[in-house]
Amino acid sequence: MSLDINQLVLHQLIKRDEQTLEVVLRDSLLDIEPVVQEMVEELHRVYSAKSKAYGLFNEESELAQALRLQRQGEEEFLGFSRAATVRLKDELAKYPFAEGGTVLFCHYRYLAVEYLLIAVLNSCNSMWVNDSLDVSSTRYLDIPHADIIARIDLTEWETSPDSLRYLTFLKGRVGRKVSDFFMDFLGAQEGLNTKVQNKGLLQAVDDFCEASDMNKQERQTCREQVYSYCNEQLQSGEEIALTELAQELPPLGDQNFAQFTEEKGYELAETFPADRSTLRQLMKYSGSGGGLTVNFDAKLLGERIFWDPATDTLTIKGTPPNLRDQLQRRVSEK
């Protein structure tokens, strides 16, 4: 992995009791030893694989102001990280769920892009067996389950300050306001909404098919082409580019798909990340509620599956063998 660590430091937040959160600050940067390199590479892999939200700094963001000074050489990275950790402690102490953790600040370069990654990592207890086959306890950083992480694309922030996506973060587990305090600490707000962009794309595809007067088979083929392209982008870690997608679809007269979306005002970004759950709607219908879960390929609608909107009735012709066996066994019990 071509990941080069420029500067890295760790600090500690320790919860002494329900009311006290203590901060322990390191006095020097870490030496970039192999184990440190391995830790950052793992954190980079874990973070890159997770679904992220996009954001940007508020005008009054203290962190952004301090980071700008650090980037201009007016403050050292260590001093910047120490002051930021104290601010994080003060922000975190406002919340009843406040917990301690290891606070990581890492400035690194990956594929010619500079990043600042900030994370609060939990430690877990475990056991290990030594060479004498004795069992001992140990503690480790729970990087795979880290959910308090933000990453600033320093390159984009400095070259495109009006961007809505130079800051990414994890929204945290359901039921915890993790992202709330972290966003307050960062002085940031949500920017590009990937789900909204992907839903807008789906609507644009449907409208494009309608405007092109496509029949049912042509519409299904069009949706499959869109899904195929978007899924390839998702798998390769690339973004959806409207100009590239337009090359996969037949034009509407003298107008391609990208021109169609611009003229109709869908407000889609030229490029944006793919959202797996939203794009799945191109290929499948699914829903659940009231003890019922339904999931089927979109191409089956009108062939084996029929919906009557007047009575809100779904008719299925030909059930899956395993479902049919279960139903037959239940009927035979009567």
Curated annotation (Swiss-Prot):
Q: What organism, scientifically named, is this protein from? A: Proteus mirabilis (strain HI4320)
The protein in question is named Nucleoid-associated protein PMI0825
Under the cellular component aspect of Gene Ontology, which terms does the record hold? bacterial nucleoid; cytoplasm
Question: HAMAP family from the xrefs?
Answer: NdpA (MF_00730)
Q: What keywords is this UniProt entry annotated with?
A: Cytoplasm
Does the keyword section mention Cytoplasm? yes
A Pfam family matched by this chain, by name? NA37
Domain of life the protein comes from:
Bacteria
A GO molecular function held by the record: double-stranded DNA binding
What does the record list as coiled-coil region(s)? Answer: none
Localization in the cell: Cytoplasm, Nucleoid
Q: Which family does it belong to?
A: Belongs to the YejK family.
Metal-binding is among the record's keywords? no
